[in-house]
A protein has these predicted regions:
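HhH-family (HhH-GPD) DNA N-glycosylase catalytic core used in base-excision repair
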Residues: 1-218
Length: 218
């Protein structure tokens, strides 16, 4: 799933490219030693305090460190279906989004295709429109994204989402009309909305009930 120019995973370490005010770009490394998460800022020259705090917030969201693991375990282990899986893999957390907009675009790219194909499309999108960075919403809003090799409806959905976020008509924050606004976009269905609620909004009640893999496992 990793985008080569933006992120990498190796030896229990996640590396992410980040935009920095004073030097353009840098890399942060997040490592797990079995009991603690460590963030290495050594490749972020002249990083500001605000930028450092923002990165820490993103790391907490991505790795779901605020989840009350013990309480979650206690509730799920009592379930007749989930209990067995909880015993097999205790302490699993829901991975969050480093960037909500990026995750939304990648969710649409991933509709009805394999993970490998979705990653291939996302990599092409970064190369063609972002020059190695994930393209800004304003840039994607005026692109014919389908030219990368996907159904036109899906490409138009990405452009519509990018335009809506850029113009402020859409948001990626919890709001009573979140699902209503996103479902009104052609090419956005319940799976995408529930995925965003789960990964971006960190909604504990979100569940992609119509996901093919989930249905197969259940």
């Amino acid at each position: 799933r990793a985008l080569p120019s933006l992120e990498a995973v190796r030896d229990n370490c996640y590396r992410r490219r980040v935009a920095l005010r004073n030097c353009g770009w840098g890399w942060v490394s997040i490592a797990w030693d079995g009991s603690h998460i460590y963030i290495d800022f050594s490749e972020c020259a002249d990083i500001t305090r605000d930028e450092r705090e923002d990165i820490v917030r993103r790391v907490r969201r991505v790795f779901d460190t605020d989840a009350q693991a013990a309480a979650i375990h206690e509730h799920l282990i009592a379930d007749s279906v989930l209990g067995t899986w909880v015993v097999e893999a205790p302490g699993l957390r829901v991975p969050g989004a480093w960037d909500g907009y990026e995750t939304a675009v990648r969710a649409i790219l991933g509709q009805q295709v394999s993970v490998a194909r979705a990653t291939e499309l996302a990599t092409k999108l970064v190369q063609e429109y972002g020059a190695g960075h994930f393209p800004a919403a304003a840039d994607l809003a005026r692109r014919e994204v389908a030219e990368l090799g996907m159904p036109g409806r899906r490409g138009r959905a990405i452009s519509t989402v990018a335009r809506g976020l850029d113009e402020g008509r859409l948001s990626l924050s919890a709001a009573p009309d979140f699902a209503e606004k996103w479902l009104a976009i052609e090419g956005i269905g319940p799976w995408t909305v529930n995925y965003l609620r789960l990964r971006v909004l960190k909604d504990p009640d979100a569940f992609p009930h119509n996901d093919w893999v989930v249905l197969k496992r259940l």
